Every structure is written in structure tokens, then in C-alpha cells.
Amino acid sequence: MEHVPNEHGRFGDFGGKFVPETLMLPLEEIETELDKALADESFRQEYIRILQHYSGRPTPLTFAPNLTRQLGGAKIYLKREDLNHTGAHKINNAIGQALLAKRMGKKKLIAETGAGQHGVAAATVAAHFGMECIVFMGEEDMKRQELNVFRMKLLGAEVVPVLSGNRTLKDATNEAIRYWVAHCDDHFYMIGSVVGPHPYPKMVREFQRVIGDEAKEQFLAGEGTLPDVIVACVGGGSNAIGMFYPFLQDDVRLVGVEAAGKGIDTPHHAATIAKGTKGVIHGAMTYLLQDEYGQIIEPYSISAGLDYPGVGPEHAYLASIGRVRYESVTDEEAVAAFQLLAQTEGIIPAIESAHAVAKAVELARQMTPDETVLICLSGRGDKDVQMMMHHLGVKEGEDVASAR
């Protein structure tokens, strides 16, 4: 595999910088400072120190014995990003970008958020580093994730409701970029996934690869070999790239799981790689959901963190060369997996992560007991419990099983 991205920020045909002239200079400044920071051992050590002492890394690699036994197939392991401070993988990237922002002398952070986890992570690091934070969030997502909205405000962030479009992640990103264009002198735009113009996909990957680096070391120590299959959910795709990147050169099957919503043959899904075509969104060439006139088709998923109409350009590249297989899981399959993991292992996953669990369960059933499946459990499900109650029709005091 060629080294990507190249000097133009391209992953094969994908990536690049499709932005207005006003953003070229800020992006070049970030790229220059990022490269310097990544080459600076003291920056790397400070990043690792904060991950360990503030976020609680390394996160454990957990064997799932009950789920494994129930399925009767491959051994299932979970990389526990749900045990990070703030409850998801998003904090890895937020710490890295906040450190870079401070190094560049920026005083204020801008973030967009879908499920709210990146917004919470941005607000958290802003509080930790003594910076201001403004978070753009679609009004629809704010309704779905009221708890995270309150968390962000509690942490001192200003949360701006976005009323345009579908009022979800795409629209929040549009507004965040508009705001950044007008305030790039003293603000740092902290993108939450491996999307956007170069150098963001590379930067977020570099701050998320700690997931895969740790998992590789832990798996080798525990099993004496690498996993046969690794599964991760894909919206923008930062947890998946973070997990996959250190394994790209190894003989390991990599499976990304998109949101099939109500079915990929309906208009209600967010399966960008399965159903999308090449186009530019938020400054990068990638696959996206668009009509014949190039207008964005609004995505849908039960998961606020997966209903993005594009995908990280590195994922588009990995799909195009066949290195990673991308599949999709419906709302109902994800809901079933959400309940299954809770009831077999006592671990409530984020609804995003439940998409990966659903696909891993399907794959593990077809495998032998001497094979292994590693799931990136990207976040915990506390934020989704209220939504799940409504979805399952559970009334207070009622048994979950009887509500179905």
C-alpha cells in the first residue's frame, strides 16, 4: 500500500482541500504546525501523559466469554473505548487537537457534534486547558441527545442549535465551518472525525491510532497472535481508522459497518460507501449520498453519530482498493445487538458501537472457536438509554423484554 495521504492530502482519488481561498492559509498553518508537533518528542510525550493521567488510557481489551459461548463461534474481544473519560473514543482526538491549538496560540475552540460525544470531549478539554469552546449541534440531534447537550453546557461550552437542512451533523458541520471562516485568527476548528479538508483526516487519524496501537500490543500479549477479524462502526469513521490503521499491513480482515437505517434499499439510511458516489463534501473528495444533480441526500440512522452523508476520505480509499470491507447494519439489528451485549456481558454499548457488535455477532457465528473477532467498542450507551426506552416502547417500571 502506498503511503497516504500524499503531500496534497490525497488518499488515491480521495481527500484534498476543496475550500474557499480564505481557508487555505489557516489550513496550511495547521498542517505545518501539526507536522512539527508530531515530530516533536516532547509534544508526543505530553499527549501520552494526558491520555494516561486524564483520560485513563490504556483502555482494556476485554474477552466476552458469555457472548462467545452463546454464539458458539469465534472468540469475541472488545477494545473498550467506552471506558475513556467522557465515555467514548472522541477524547483521544480532542486532547491532541487542543494541545496543538495551545501550541499555535489559539484561545478558543470550535466544534461540531452529532451524537454529542465530540462536543462533550471538546468542552471537556477546553475546561481542562482553560480555553473557550463553542459547539454547533443540529436541533434534531439536540432533541435526541439532551443529556449530552446539558453536559456540554455544564462544562462551560456555548451550544449553538443549527436549524438548517435536516438539523443533524452535516448541517452542524456547515455552520461550524462558516463560523471558522469568520474567526480563524484566534479560533481553532476541532473536527471530530476523519473528514474535512487536509490535514484534518490525517490529524484525526494520528490522534486516534492509539486505539489500534494499544489493541495490537494487547492482543499479541494475550493471544500470542493478531485477531482474524476487526470490526468497527463507520459514520465519519474516526474510531474505525484509529483501530484499522496499525493493522493495514497485517493479514487481518478489516470490516467497517455503516448505518443501514430502515434498509439500504429504502431512502432512510446512511450507508455512504454502499450507496454513495464520488463528490465533495466539507472540503474533501469522498463518497457521499447525493442525487443526480449533486444535491446531498439527507442520511438517516437511529444513531446520531452515524447519520452523516459522507465518509472519511481514507475510508473511501480503503474501500476503493479493497483493503477494508464495508457492510451495513439496520436500526433493528443494532438495537438487538445493544440489548444482547448488555444482557450477556453487562456492558451497555453506544448505539453507534452496537452496529459493529451486530456485524461481529453475524461474522463470529460463521467462524470456528479457534478464530478471533475484535470489536472496537467506540463508546458507552448511557447517552442512548432514554432514546432506547422510547424506541422499545418501555414505560417506567416495565420489563424491557415485555415491551417488545
From Swiss-Prot:
It catalyses: (1S,2R)-1-C-(indol-3-yl)glycerol 3-phosphate + L-serine = D-glyceraldehyde 3-phosphate + L-tryptophan + H2O. Its cofactor is pyridoxal 5'-phosphate. Its EC number is 4.2.1.20. It comes from the Bacteria. Pathway: Amino-acid biosynthesis; L-tryptophan biosynthesis; L-tryptophan from chorismate: step 5/5. GO terms for molecular function: tryptophan synthase activity. It is an enzyme of class 4 (lyase). The keyword Metal-binding does not apply. InterPro entries: Trp_synth_b_CS, Trp_synth_beta, Trp_synth_beta/beta-like, TrpB-like_PALP, TrpB-like_PALP_sf. One of its GO terms (cellular component) is cytoplasm. Keywords: Amino-acid biosynthesis, Aromatic amino acid biosynthesis, Lyase, Pyridoxal phosphate, Tryptophan biosynthesis. The modification N6-(pyridoxal phosphate)lysine is found at residue 90. Belongs to the TrpB family. The beta subunit is responsible for the synthesis of L-tryptophan from indole and L-serine. Tetramer of two alpha and two beta chains. This is Tryptophan synthase beta chain. It comes from Geobacillus thermodenitrificans (strain NG80-2).
